[in-house]
């Protein structure tokens, strides 16, 4: 499982850095989409509604599954899809929303290898954004940065790899 977070806290990012980061994130999503079993799921994966939507440009709609705001269900669905051979790429528009899926992440996905005696080792990719105030300020609920605290907690989760582009 990989958590791929965009840690963008500063509101003062120069244009070249922002464009380079956007290009890299878009290319990463296209690379994942090249996998025949890849499925992107979450809020605003089929309809523009957040800044992460633009990184899905060029990915076929048939590889996107639009979901309601139900973060724990989304993670649970991803685990089930992974067990069926899919490569689920979860899109959580904000880190705050990922925290609502922690039950599935640490109590189910983390333990499936042990519970199945090694028969199942589901792969799930999670994409989220941390503390962004651009292109719009989302207010006090969605601009805090708990990434470091979450990273420290998730270091104990087996098979988890956390990446964060600078």
PLM feature spans:
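Thiamine diphosphate
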Residues: 1-166
């Amino acid at each position: 499982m990989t958590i791929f977070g965009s840690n963008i806290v500063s509101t003062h990012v120069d244009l070249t850095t922002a464009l380079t980061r956007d290009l890299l994130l878009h290319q990463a999503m296209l690379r994942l989409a090249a996998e025949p079993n890849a499925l992107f799921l979450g809020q605003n994966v089929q309809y523009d509604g957040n800044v992460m939507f633009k990184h899905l440009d060029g990915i076929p709609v048939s590889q996107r599954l639009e979901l309601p705001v139900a973060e724990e269900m989304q993670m649970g669905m991803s685990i089930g899809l992974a067990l069926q051979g899919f490569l689920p790429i979860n899109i959580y528009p904000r880190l705050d929303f990922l925290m609502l899926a922690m039950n599935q992440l640490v109590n189910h996905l983390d333990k499936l290898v042990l519970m199945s005696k090694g028969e199942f080792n589901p792969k799930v990719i999670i994409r989220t954004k941390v503390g962004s105030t651009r292109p719009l300020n989302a207010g006090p609920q969605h601009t805090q940065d708990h990434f470091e605290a979450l990273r420290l907690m998730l270091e104990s989760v087996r098979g988890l790899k956390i990446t964060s582009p600078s």
